[in-house]
Amino acid sequence: MALNVELVSPTQQVWSGQATFVSARTIEGDLGVLPGHAPLFGVLVDGAVSIKGVDGTTKEFNVQGGFFSVSNDRVSILTESVN
């Protein structure tokens, strides 16, 4: 089982694909998501988003605020900017 993940900024789709784990920092603290996670919505703070792809590689992105949502093994990360 995998997560369908999309990381987008106002100007581009930064990353899209399947992952086994996603982590990010929200205003409520660090958050980790595995397949089967309950639905949630969070507000991102500036910091790292980590995506572990189904191939075992991990991608790290530095985001500047935004939103994080999980529903039915779909993770959407909408950020103001990515470095």
Q: Where do the language-model regions lie?
A:
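Compact, glycine-rich, soluble single-domain proteins
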Residues: 2-83
